[in-house]
A protein has these predicted regions:
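Hydrophobic, aromatic-enriched interface-forming segments
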Residues: 117-210
Length: 308
């Protein structure tokens, strides 16, 4: 079967688990917007994980709350959907019920870290001094920005494929995974650019009522950095609106996330993003805006401030 998943830590964990329980012949790492826009053709021999549902797919696994709004017909697919800390946890739960859980038990430590990372149940220390699987989660997260830099020994897609086997061989030993030369060169860049990233966040961010607005449009070279650091810098805010240029400048991306330390926001972000054609969870989501993005951003911000 062909596995189609997201290019992040959760998508990677899904791939690791599915390799244990299904015959995976090929893997594609894709952007959720391409799936939403119908640019990815799927069929009965495909597995879709951590991505929006597409009619006709063989198996679908997801946990994004926005999919409840988007797809009311839950009888038309095979696989599993549930509100869970991660899509990898949904995959795990499905195969445990199918009697194949024994093959997946050795990934318990990895799964706990994926759950913690994807649901953003992190401590201040996890963000400022990450290590182990948590550090890997930030390195593999496209939002960290490491993939936009060049000069690596292998491409990011090649690294994702390599990581599946590397994790399978070392399910209880994240330090061995982190020591791999192709992983380590990305870790080194992550820490080298942390100061520049923090400075840029301060320069490009303002606070309106309860919301941080970080406008990164026009930034030619974005330093890599942890997207959660912003909440350590503005602890009084409970939500962030992050705006940046989309692929090839064809659209504007608006990413919204609850503060992981000041958890007082009343906005269901996934539902709000769905209204504009995006998606996500209650605590985080994004949307790609093509028509009059400025007005739509102000409308999104107004709702966030009104909700408190």
């Amino acid at each position: 079967m062909r596995l189609i998943t997201r290019s992040d830590f959760d998508g990677l964990a899904c791939a690791v688990l599915l390799h244990e329980v299904e015959q995976i012949d090929s893997i594609e790492f894709v952007h959720p917007k391409d799936v939403q826009d119908g640019k990815i053709s799927v069929g009965s021999n495909d597995i879709l994980t951590n991505l929006p549902y597409q009619f006709g797919v063989g198996l679908w696994f997801d946990h994004h709350s926005s999919e409840i709004v988007r797809n009311e017909d839950t009888a038309s697919y095979r696989g599993r959907f549930e509100i869970a800390p991660s899509a990898a946890r949904v995959v795990y739960n499905h195969y445990v019920e199918k009697g194949k859980g024994e093959k997946l038990l050795r990934y318990d430590g990895l799964l706990q870290s994926v759950d913690k990372s994807d649901s953003a149940k992190l401590s201040m220390n996890d963000v400022t001094k990450p290590g182990g699987w948590m550090l890997l989660s930030f390195v593999m997260d496209p939002r960290t920005g490491l993939a936009y830099h060049h000069g690596y020994r292998i491409s990011n897609r090649e690294l994702m494929t390599k990581m599946i086997e590397l994790i399978a061989k070392n399910p209880d030993d994240p330090d061995t995974v982190l020591a791999d030369p192709d992983v380590k060169e990305r870790i080194d860049r992550y820490f080298q650019q942390q100061e520049a990233f923090t400075q840029l966040m301060r320069e490009r961010s303002t606070v309106e009522k309860n919301a941080i607005i970080t406008d990164l449009r026009g930034v030619a070279e974005m330093p890599s950095g942890n997207r959660f650091l912003i909440y350590t810098m503005f602890p009084q805010a409970n939500i962030q609106v992050r705006v940046f240029d989309g692929r090839k400048g064809e659209f504007v991306v608006c990413a919204v996330g609850h503060s992981i330390f000041n958890r007082t926001s009343r906005t269901d972000v996934g539902a709000l993003m769905d209204k504009y054609g995006g998606g996500g969870h209650r605590g985080a989501g994004s949307v790609s805006l093509m028509d009059d993005p400025e007005q739509q951003i102000r409308m999104i911000l107004a709702e966030l401030k009104a909700n408190g």
